[in-house]
Design a protein with these regions (language model features):
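Catalytic cores of carbohydrate-active enzymes across secretory and cytosolic contexts
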Residues: 1-194
Length: 194
């Protein structure tokens, strides 16, 4: 879909390990696109990643990106190490890690991090950037009149006199969505009043 819909030279963001192979397909189909990939889960160390039967295909695909990002420098280094040792990517210079990433006693601290990789004539920028929230802003917005009125509209539109049960989670087989639906089914079977 991204290949068919993206404008000439657009940036396509790909998210998480479920789509490891997507950048390679996108690059083959649309070499004009800028491809960014963000890995939302820990990228394993070489000793674990090297066991995967598709390790080379995964790395070659991710190395089709213009930018590959991870939450913390350790995961960035794990990826850089895998790419250099398993498929021969060339490592760019290491740069100092932002102090917010370095805490005494933190097992995942890195003092420096690889800035980029070179592979098949391409430069792949590496990014360490935790995805976080701004609790103060969320709290402020939560109680604002506009959000409260939107909330009321949602309640009126969705409930319509019914009970509403909501679950918010990632659509990933490891998150137990099927089990959640089965549990809900059992609840409805046992509690006819719901």
């Amino acid at each position: 879909a991204a290949c068919a819909e993206a404008a000439e030279g657009a940036t396509v963001w790909v998210h998480d390990y479920n789509l490891w192979l997507a950048p390679g397909y996108i690059r083959a189909e649309r070499p004009d696109l800028k491809i960014a990939f963000f890995h939302h889960t820990p990228f394993p160390g070489n000793d674990v990643f090297a066991i995967l039967p598709w390790r080379e295909q995964i790395l070659e695909s991710l190395l089709c990106c213009d930018v590959v990002g991870f939450h913390i420098p350790r995961y960035t280094e794990n990826f850089a190490r895998a790419a250099t040792t398993l498929v021969g990517a060339k490592r760019g210079p290491k740069v100092p890690v932002d102090k917010k990433f370095i805490e005494v006693g933190t097992a995942l601290s890195e003092g420096t991090v690889t800035s980029h990789l070179q592979h098949n004539g391409r430069t792949i920028q590496l990014l360490s950037s935790p995805v976080g929230t701004s609790p103060d802003l969320i709290q402020e917005l939560c109680w604002s009149p506009s959000v409260e009125s939107h909330g009321e509209l949602i309640v009126q539109d969705t409930k319509k006199g019914r009970k509403l049960i909501l679950s918010a989670s990632r659509v990933d087989y490891t998150k137990g969505n099927e089990e959640l639906l089965l549990a809900f089914e059992r609840l409805l079977e046992r509690r006819k009043d719901l």
